[in-house]
From Swiss-Prot:
Belongs to the DNA gyrase inhibitor YacG family. Signal peptide: none annotated. PANTHER family: DNA GYRASE INHIBITOR YACG. Keywords: Metal-binding, Zinc. Interacts with GyrB. Its cofactor is Zn(2+). InterPro entries: DNA_gyrase_inhibitor_YacG, Znf_NHR/GATA. This is DNA gyrase inhibitor YacG. Binds 1 zinc ion. The keyword Transcription does not apply. One of its GO terms (molecular function) is zinc ion binding.
Length: 64
């Protein structure tokens, strides 16, 4: 018999079974999934970086 793995929904904290029974995992529902997506889209969440971009990084919006 396999062990049931439970995780907490990152949005609301509700327990979620990690398996096919939970189609929105790690979220408990579509609503929590969309709340999280909205936070990423609004840049309320981000992956931390060690440094910023500088002018010498050859990033340009100009067409060549």
């Amino acid at each position: 018999m396999s062990e049931v793995i439970n995780v907490n929904c990152p949005t609301c904290g509700k327990a979620v079974v990690w398996g096919e029974i939970s189609p929105f995992r790690p979220f408990c529902c579509k609503r929590c999934q969309l709340i999280d997506l909205g936070e990423w889209a609004a840049e309320e969440k981000r992956i931390p970086s060690e440094g910023g971009l500088s002018d010498s990084d050859d990033w340009s919006e100009e067409l060549k």
